[in-house]
Amino acid sequence: MTREQDLGRRGEEIAAQHLIGRGYTLVERNWRCREGEIDLVMTHAGTTVLVEVKTRAGLGYGHPLEAVTRAKASRLRVLAGLWCQAHPDRRGPVRIDVVGVLWPRGGQPSVEVVRSAC
């Protein structure tokens, strides 16, 4: 596993714990299909929440949330539709949240959540 992959994995764990601490329930991690991957599938207040997590160790490449471009947001919407097709038993509202984790080396991670980001 590369340093970037390890940072991403740890960022997903930080994001999951942050959301669980705010009343979300974890349903699934790293759901994959031929079109891509959804980092976290959670529920919150009767809504299925599909979560994209972006983690950075610094701001050299911009804030983690800046990594979700229009193209990425469009792809997340496609993935959301595919997830819903694959889980017809999950009825009700669905939204896509984006979580940015900024975790400087030697520092504490900071977490920012954008609800209904896409």
From Swiss-Prot:
CDD domains: PoNe_Nuclease. InterPro entries: Restrct_endonuc-II-like (IPR011335), tRNA_endonuc-like_dom_sf (IPR011856), UPF0102_YraN-like (IPR003509). GO terms for molecular function: nucleic acid binding. Gene3D superfamilies: 3.40.1350.10. SUPFAM superfamilies: Restriction endonuclease-like (SSF52980). HAMAP family: UPF0102. Belongs to the UPF0102 family. NCBIfam families: PRK12497.1-3 (NF009150), PRK12497.3-3 (NF009154). This is UPF0102 protein CMM_1377. It comes from Clavibacter michiganensis subsp. michiganensis (strain NCPPB 382). The lineage of its organism: Bacteria, Bacillati, Actinomycetota, Actinomycetes, Micrococcales.
